[in-house]
Swiss-Prot record:
Domain of life (superkingdom): Bacteria
Record bears the keyword ATP-binding: no
Organism: Latilactobacillus sakei subsp. sakei (strain 23K) (Lactobacillus sakei subsp. sakei)
Cellular component GO terms held in the UniProt record: ribonucleoprotein complex; ribosome
Function, in words: Binds directly to 23S ribosomal RNA and is necessary for the in vitro assembly process of the 50S ribosomal subunit. It is not involved in the protein synthesizing functions of that subunit.
Keywords on record: Ribonucleoprotein, Ribosomal protein, RNA-binding, rRNA-binding
Gene Ontology terms describing biological process: ribosomal large subunit assembly; translation
InterPro entries: Ribosomal_bL20, RIBOSOMAL_L20_CS, Ribosomal_protein_bL20_C
PANTHER family, sorted: 39S RIBOSOMAL PROTEIN L20
A Gene Ontology molecular function term of the record: rRNA binding
Protein name as annotated: Large ribosomal subunit protein bL20
Family, similarity comment: Belongs to the bacterial ribosomal protein bL20 family.
Segments crossing the lipid bilayer: none
Length: 119
């Protein structure tokens, strides 16, 4: 069986990595070895940060809900407990959107939570 030299395959594979490394600084977009290393690191960061993004958005929503709830004389934890008691099923994303874009609707939700807590 004759020996097959992998020139075209190797070139294609390296070209693919260098294309992924486009926009990197210094040798990291020019040299295969450093580009390959950086692309692997970038993949690791992307994997980690896709999960981090979910945590970050949840933190942002909670901060917005807390700020709006405190403007209505209620803490975040009291509001969430009140909503649970009142059986109002709204997720944090929806509540944060109400707090930012429709203050009157958010105030009515807070009043419903207060009423449920005072029963």
């Amino acid at each position: 069986m004759p020996r097959v030299k992998g020139g075209t395959v190797t070139r294609k594979r390296r070209k693919k990595i260098l294309k992924l490394a486009k926009g990197y600084r210094g040798a990291k977009h020019l040299l295969f070895k450093s580009a390959n290393t950086q692309v692997m690191v970038s993949y690791r960061y992307a994997f980690r940060d896709r999960r981090q993004r979910k945590r970050d958005f949840r933190k942002l929503w909670i901060a917005r809900i807390n700020a709006a709830a405190r403007m209505n004389d209620m803490s975040y934890s009291q509001l969430m407990h009140g909503l649970r008691v009142a059986e109002i099923d709204m997720n944090r994303k929806m509540l944060a959107d109400l707090a930012v874009n429709d203050a009157a609707a958010f105030t009515s939700v807070v009043e419903a939570a207060k009423a449920a807590l005072n029963k």
